[in-house]
């Protein structure tokens, strides 16, 4: 009878390592997807009086009353609290380009705790 202890130990160790990596990748993708959804929900629910154009860059601000406004005016040209810069993709999704001093956790809570 062959001693298969080394084969079994090495095999299960390799499986655990690969599955742990796969789960970490799934978790990272899940968090990124939730954040992407939250940003789009925030931008689409903000106030704006124009139809955003695919490929253009826009700026999200927060008023003192807590409401959000989407604008074509850059942060160095306006007085409102700058939240983020977004760009509208061909899928009509707002892609986050940069974020101001307000963190995602402040805006949406902590998705890592999900």
Predicted regions and their residues:
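Phosphate-interacting basic helix/loop segments used at nucleotide- and nucleic-acid interfaces
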Residues: 30-46
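Serine/threonine-rich low-complexity intrinsically disordered regions
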Residues: 8, 13-16, 38, 89, ...
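Anionic-ligand-binding alpha/beta catalytic cores of soluble enzymes and soluble regulatory domains
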Residues: 17, 27, 31
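Short linear sequence elements within intrinsically disordered, low-complexity coil regions
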Residues: 35, 42, 63-66, 113
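Short acidic DE-rich linear segments
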Residues: 108-114
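Domain-scale macromolecular recognition modules
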Residues: 45-108
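Short, charged, low-complexity amphipathic alpha-helix
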Residues: 1-23
């Amino acid at each position: 009878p062959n001693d298969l202890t080394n084969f079994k130990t090495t095999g299960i160790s390799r499986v655990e390592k690969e599955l742990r990596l796969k789960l970490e990748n799934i978790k990272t993708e899940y968090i990124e997807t939730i954040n992407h959804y939250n940003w789009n929900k925030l931008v689409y629910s903000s106030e704006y009086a124009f139809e955003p154009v695919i490929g253009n860059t826009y700026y999200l601000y927060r008023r003192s009353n807590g409401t959000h406004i989407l604008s074509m005016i850059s942060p160095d040209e306006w007085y409102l609290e700058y939240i983020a810069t977004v760009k509208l993709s061909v899928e009509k999704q707002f892609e986050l380009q940069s974020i101001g001093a307000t963190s995602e956790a402040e805006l949406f809570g902590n998705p890592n705790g999900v």
